[in-house]
Amino acid sequence: MWEKMETKTIVYDLDTSGGLMEQIQALLAPPKTDEAEKRSRKPEKESRRSGRATNHDSCDSCKEGGDLLCCDHCPAAFHLQCCNPPLSEEMLPPGEWMCHRCTVRRKKREQKKELGHVNGLVDKSSKRTTSPSSDTDLLDRPASKTELKAIAHARILERRASRPGTPTSNASTETPTSEHNDVDEDIVDVDEEPVAAEPDYVQPQLRRPFELLIAAAMERNPTQFQLPNELTCTTALPGSSKRRRKEETTGKNVKRTQHELDHNGLVPLPVKVCFTCNRSCRVAPLIQCDYCPLLFHMDCLEPPLTAMPLGRWMCPNHIEHVVLNQKNLTLSNRCQVFDRFQDTISQHVVKVDFLNRIHKKHPPNRRVLQSVKRRSLKVPDAIKSQYQFPPPLIAPAAIRDGELICSGVPEESQTHLLNSEHLATQAEQQEWLCSVVALQCSILKHLSAKQMPSPWDSEQTEKADIKPVIVTDSSITTSLQTADKAPLPSHYPLSCPSAVSTQNSLGCSPPHQPPTLEDISCSSCVEKSKKAPCGTANGPVNTEIKANGPHLYSSPTDSTDPRRLPGANTPLPGLTHRQGWPRPLTPPSAGGLQNHVGIIVKTENATGPSSCPQRSLVPVPSLPPSIPSSCASIENTSTLHRKTVQSQIGPSSTESRPLGSPPNATRVLTPPQAAGDSILATGANQRFCSPAPSSDGKVSPGTLSIGSALTVPSFPANSTAMVDLTNSLRAFMDVNGEIEINMLDEKLIKFLALQRVHQLFPSRVQASPGNVGTHPLASGGHHPEVQRKEVQARAVFCPLLGLGGAVNMCYRTLYIGTGADMDVCLTNYGHCNYVSGKHACIFYDENTKHYELLNYSEHGTTVDNVLYSCDFSEKTPPTPPSSIVAKVQSVIRRRRHQKQDEEPSEEAAMMSSQAQGPQRRPCNCKASSSSLIGGSGAGWEGTALLHHGSYIKLGCLQFVFSITEFATKQPKGDASLLQDGVLAEKLSLKPHQGPVLRSNSVP
């Protein structure tokens, strides 16, 4: 029964191993971040063999990655080309590969085994291979002398056998990069440790001191050379490369904490702002300084940056910028300066250092920046002597020898200027005018007081050569004044001194006495200065002007009606105006010289009408006493005759020229000369041809051209032969004004016939060598083709002493000297002992567009008061020759002296520029110009720059260089505007005003 009442045990299916608290805590726990799990995770590497598990990922030699060949016995890895010896893919072994170090050690172990068998130490050698400490045990136990010698000898053999057959690479050991190799060597090369413990036994067996080092180096793997750490620059200088994180190099945007920068320079919260503008990175990316916590925008920097810096960047708040920017600092100095300023600087130290500096008694010199030195040039001794001993000054450029030098009409660019801007003041003009009038009056008084020369001899005229001659403005004035000394009546109103000479030339001889020259006023000429200004009487010049190119003297004609003088049935023949002369065109040269082309008269007339009309050499009938000799009456008669001449020649170019325009001619300035000089020869008026007589044998005196009247035999202008010739022509005139040829004198007929022969045969007269200075009479009218082929003159070389003629420079060069082949032969201009055969040369430089003079003479040439001569200074000797050269020169010099002593003495023939023969004639030179050089004797051998009006002196011969383009500059403008009187007056220079000289461009 009790068995029935026994209860059964209840079994519950519950897990009693643990409670539910862990699960409850896991459900109630906060969420976990994944960063810890990611960081804790490590990539599982593949299981590799133990031998290759420690191989390096980069080459042990060059420390670069790539395809590497791994050693099977050590962790070393190499490129195929970095192995020792280098390998190729075909040379790779099929089985295991050992590096050079492992190969050497394997051979070493094998040799040790063989050596142990030889010496009967097989057991010990076997133990040595099994136990790494066998060598130490061997040394600890006592050994005999024979055993020690055997061991030492074995070590030497091992080192010799360990040398491979091929040499190692050029690289040596490298301390910081061979850490793995050193560890492996310590593990594997334990058997080498006893070598250091027994140096006494090894050293006596070594033959060379570095044999042990070489043996150790031969066992190492090849490595590239690198400086040790103590020699390498470890200072982080600005601009050096810095290590980047792997995320930056791979470009992965890794999530970082909020206080760090991302790789784009954007700064999340907490906000960091720019040090300059205090704005965040939302404006622009910020740049973090690598040496301080400051940040900057790229645009806030000075100067602003265009890109983010790649290396280390230092902000401008550091003092190192001032010190490190110096160019003379080396790398070691930069590192020292950078390390010095790395720590914080004490303000107290700065103050004390400043006080010590300012209280120093002898402060150090400041570093002064060396300024860039200009290129220095050594001043020649010739220029120094020129400033030390200046020559005497020449006359002013505006007035020379009492004659005004004008520069022509201003250019178009200067026409807008008023007359007062480029002319003298009114007071200066009045003073200049009074001086010119007083000068002319004194010249007339001097010339009128001279004695009249002897009359013309008719017999000498027949034998002498008949050459066409004409008188210029300056020479006619003085020559006609001395022709007739008859006084003028006191009641004649004379307008200017030129009227005296004009009336005297006309043959007037009233009984009354003339007034004094001081009482003569020039008021009428001043009033009519625009039409007929008074010119200066410079006197005749005995020269033959040699023309070089076509120069046509053309000017406007007056529009006044022809007037006849009261009491005379015919107009005054031969009275012409200067502006009516046509400019002659010269034929080719006739002397064999390139610059001696022809003959031309060049006058100084820069403004329209010329001076009072005393222009004719042909005498006219005497005037009645009641006729007033004024400039206007004579001007009208000259205009009448000029119109008559132009009607014979044909259409003239002078009709088309507006009134007031100056003639396009070359002006040559000649100084005043004595009254006894001969007449200036020219061919200016020889272009006019006298017509053939009519069928009835009568010729009208009005049809006689200027050329026929002026082309007379070369006799003095002041003789009475011309007056007699004119009177004989008037005696045979009939009532109608025609001349009966049958009634003419025989001499007059011969003269007219000879003139006609010159007109008909110009080529024969021109080709004759004696007529170089002459000019054909009709070449201008009969040979227009020749005129077009002629060359116009570039410049004129004019003498100042009255001898010789002016030479035109029509080509680029002009040679001056006493030689026969010179363009300007100085013997024609006077005698001087200090001139050379080839004295100087004038040439035109295309680069500088200027004329230049080059001196060849040892006497020198003075240009514009500056001496240009040869350099006679002692030249510095070159470097002394070597001993061998000096000995050879001494032998040659000694041999030359011996030959001179053996030869008979003869007079040494010397070449000299001075003429050999009779004694030289004296000249006006006191000494050669080269004597004016300073004591050093260094003359200036450069070229002289020539301008318009440059003064040239060759010895005692004086010349003036004139540029034709400068003297003939024409105003550019419309012809209709030039006809306006007001504008023409502004553009033209008045003759009584002193113009200001201006430089002009060279042609």
From Swiss-Prot:
Organism: Mus musculus (Mouse)
Zinc finger motifs (PHD-type), residue ranges: 56-105, 271-321
Region (SIN3 interacting domain 1): 202-241
Subunit structure as annotated in this protein's UniProt entry: Component of SIN3 complexes. Interacts with SIN3A in a complex composed of HDAC1, SAP30 and SIN3A. Component of the SIN3B complex, which includes SIN3B, HDAC2 or HDAC1, PHF12 and MORF4L1; interacts directly with all subunits. Interacts with TLE5.
Protein's recorded name: PHD finger protein 12
Phosphothreonine modification, residue list: 557, 570, 670
Pfam families per record: PHD, PHF12_MRG_bd
Main function: Transcriptional repressor acting as key scaffolding subunit of SIN3 complexes which contributes to complex assembly by contacting each core subunit domain, stabilizes the complex and constitutes the substrate receptor by recruiting the H3 histone tail. SIN3 complexes are composed of a SIN3 scaffold subunit, one catalytic core (HDAC1 or HDAC2) and 2 chromatin targeting modules. SIN3B complex represses transcription and counteracts the histone acetyltransferase activity of EP300 through the recognition H3K27ac marks by PHF12 and the activity of the histone deacetylase HDAC2.
Taxonomic placement: Eukaryota, Metazoa, Chordata, Craniata, Vertebrata
